[in-house]
Amino acid sequence: MAAHCQVTGAQPGFGHSISHSHRRTKRRWNPNIQKKRYWVPSLRRNVTLNLSAKGIKVIDARGIDAVVNELIARGEKI
């Protein structure tokens, strides 16, 4: 599963882990991506989305129909 939220666009952040002696090693901060399935009444089918925790909250606040219509307008594969 790709570390990318379909609603918010959250992607991994990159940087360094810094030890006590200040040695730097590469690391990445992954977003909290969950695979969620929603019933979309306007499409009359289930839709599976890769969402961050914030993306799930956005759907709870705005509604699945509004978010899916925005994704379709953006050209996102659903």
Swiss-Prot record:
One record GO biological process: translation
Transmembrane segments: none
One annotated Gene Ontology cellular component of this protein: ribonucleoprotein complex
Cleavable signal peptide: none
Residue ranges, annotated region (Disordered): 1-30
Compositional bias segments (type: Basic residues): 19-30
Short name of any one Pfam family annotated for the protein: Ribosomal_L28
Alphabetical keyword list: Ribonucleoprotein, Ribosomal protein
MF annotations from Gene Ontology: structural constituent of ribosome
Family in the record: Belongs to the bacterial ribosomal protein bL28 family.
PANTHER family linked: 39S RIBOSOMAL PROTEIN L28, MITOCHONDRIAL, LARGE RIBOSOMAL SUBUNIT PROTEIN BL28M
Protein name in UniProt: Large ribosomal subunit protein bL28
Organism: Kocuria rhizophila (strain ATCC 9341 / DSM 348 / NBRC 103217 / DC2201)
